[in-house]
Every structure is written in structure tokens, then in C-alpha cells.
């Protein structure tokens, strides 16, 4: 589910860019322990009262955003940890650990999601048609991929979200190089890949990527190349894709198995009495302790800049930029 504070009550912390200013791994992990506490509390409370499925009660969180903020035209840059790959990596690992709980627990607390994989940094208007090409290999491996690699290998993130744009001619959600060669074969990722919302439609919609002729072909290509789950409607055409010989049921079963494994790992298929996380009270949501932590990190995130006579700019001396 998307972050709970969009349409429901929850403790609200500073935007990601603000928390990045703190550069405190332990504090960020502690913050996301409280976020996962509130997520678990909402999930079990909804199930007990017959409200589950109405929205904002799920256990998968599309967070953290570990893209690198390079283009100021990207209107969602404040969701990132900034332009520095190392800072982004350390903060991203802390988020995942706080969200997913102890590695040796019987059940995962929640599932975090590393997004948007990969090389996704705006501008926003072009993301459904843009092709990332001619990217220097050093920039790819030293700037854009380190955070994703660390979240997979160090934090064992349980979901990865593929991005909207193309990478070297292929939509990211259909990129064999990104999803199979790098993510699974090189980094050893074993878990679920989910598309960004509507990304599979971009494969064939007019005026977007137009790399595939129709929904069935697009869906088959996405699954074959590693996108297990779609946020959208096009995977409804997978039965047609099987009938046309574009994909086998066996390959679809591989993705289905990953999805079911994720749900079993969260304890969704078991009675709440068997899942220790179910004992987190709904009273923890937006509680005083969490509010005090939000105030603390807000204070620590403030950055003061000393103006040494630079501002306001003198029109006569500023020259051209």
C-alpha cells in the first residue's frame, strides 16, 4: 500500500529530503520501525473489524525511493534522499531494515520496495516515453545502481519496482538486462518485482514507448523478463498471451509462486494468533511517542545556510547563467 498518511491517520514525519539532512542511519531505522508498527496495527485492526481491502491497510509499502535526484525539473525529487549515491544507499538500507523487521523473525513485519529501478530521475513529463541511452557505464554502476544493489544484497528488500522509462531501448519493466541479468543473475535477487502503475500500458499505448503491438504481447514480455506483478490492468490479457503462444503457464507460475511466497512470509495466510506482529495495538497509530519522534527528527533536519552577501542577486553584476 502507499504511505498511510495520504488518506488516513498516521504519524507524519518530514519529507524524505528533510530526513536525508539528518544523515543518521539509526534514527531513520527507528522511524521506520514506528511506520511498520502503525502499518501492522492498521492491517490487523482492519481484518478484525471486516474492513480489510478498502485501502491503506496492506503490508507492502512502496518505499524507499532510492533514485538519484539530478534533474531539478523532477517534481517528485523531494521523495528521494538527494543526489548522493552513498547517502541514498545508507538511508535506503535503514528504511528497509526498519520496515521489514528482524531477519530471523518467523514472519516479515512488512515488505519494503526499492523503487524506481532504474535510472529514473525525471523530468516527470517524459517518463512514459523517454529512453535512457548512451549512459556511461561508470555513471550507471557508481551513481544509479549502488543503492539498489545494497538494498538487495545487504537489506534483503522483498520487493523491487521497475520504472516507467526505457533503458537502452527496452521499457524498464521489460528489460532483460535490468531485471534478469543484473537484478537476479548478478545480484541474486529472489523476490518479487512489481511494475509502477500503468507501466505495462506504456509498452503499447500510442505516444508512449510503442515497443510492443498490444496488451497481450506487452504482458508476456514483462513477465518473461522478470516483472511478476502489475499495478494496472494489462495482465488480464495473459490468458490470451498463453493461447497465442507468447508465454507458457509454467513461466506465469514462477511469478505466481513469488507472489504467494511474499504473502506467506507476511503471515497473511495464517491466523492472527500465530503472528506475533498482530499484538501491536491500534493505539500505537499516531501515538505520543511517535509524535515526539517526528518532532525530534524535524528539528534535526533543519539546515541553516549563511548568506555571505550572495543574495539578493544584483541584476547588474549577476551576468548570465
Q: Predicted regions span which residues?
A:
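Glycoside hydrolase catalytic-domain context in secreted enzymes
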Residues: 1-3, 7-321
Amino acid at each position: 500500500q502507499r504511505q498511510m498518511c495520504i488518506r488516513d491517520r498516521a504519524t507524519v514525519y518530514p519529507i524524505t529530503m528533510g530526513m536525508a539532512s539528518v544523515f543518521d542511519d539509526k534514527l531513520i531505522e527507528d522511524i521506520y520501525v514506528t511506520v511498520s508498527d502503525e502499518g501492522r496495527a492498521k492491517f490487523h485492526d482492519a481484518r478484525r473489524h471486516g474492513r480489510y481491502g478498502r485501502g491503506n491497510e496492506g503490508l507492502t509499502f512502496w518505499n524507499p525511493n532510492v533514485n538519484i535526484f539530478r534533474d531539478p525539473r523532477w517534481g517528485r525529487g523531494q521523495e528521494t534522499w538527494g543526489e548522493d549515491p552513498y547517502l541514498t544507499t545508507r538511508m535506503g538500507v535503514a528504511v528497509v531494515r526498519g520496515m521489514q523487521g528482524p531477519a530471523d523473525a518467523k514472519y516479515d513485519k512488512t515488505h519494503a520496495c526499492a523503487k524506481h529501478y532504474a535510472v529514473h530521475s525525471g523530468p516527470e513529463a517524459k517518463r512514459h516515453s523517454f529512453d535512457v541511452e548512451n549512459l556511461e557505464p561508470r555513471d550507471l554502476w557508481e551513481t544509479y545502481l549502488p543503492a539498489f544493489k545494497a538494498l538487495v544484497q545487504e537489506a534483503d528488500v522483498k520487493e523491487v519496482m521497475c520504472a516507467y522509462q526505457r533503458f537502452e531501448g527496452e521499457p524498464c519493466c521489460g528489460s532483460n538486462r535490468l531485471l534478469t541479468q543484473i537484478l537476479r543473475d548478478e545480484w541474486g535477487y529472489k523476490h518479487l518485482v512489481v511494475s509502477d502503475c500503468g507501466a505495462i500500458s506504456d509498452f503499447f499505448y500510442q505516444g508512449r514507448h510503442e515497443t510492443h503491438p498490444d496488451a497481450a504481447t506487452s504482458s508476456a514480455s514483462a513477465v518473461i523478463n522478470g516483472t511478476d506483478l502489475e499495478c494496472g490492468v494489462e495482465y488480464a490479457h495473459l490468458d490470451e498471451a498463453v493461447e497465442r503462444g507468447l508465454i507458457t503457464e509454467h513461466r506465469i507460475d514462477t511469478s505466481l509462486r513469488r507472489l504467494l511466497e511474499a504473502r506467506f512470509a507476511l503471515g497473511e495466510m495464517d491466523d492472527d494468533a500465530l503472528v506475533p506482529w498482530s499484538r501491536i495495538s491500534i493505539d500505537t497509530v499516531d501515538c505520543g511517542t511517535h509524535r515526539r519522534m517526528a518532532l525530534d527528527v524535524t528539528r534535526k533536519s533543519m539546515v541553516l545556510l549563511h548568506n555571505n552577501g550572495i543574495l539578493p542577486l544584483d541584476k547588474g553584476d549577476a551576468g548570465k547563467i
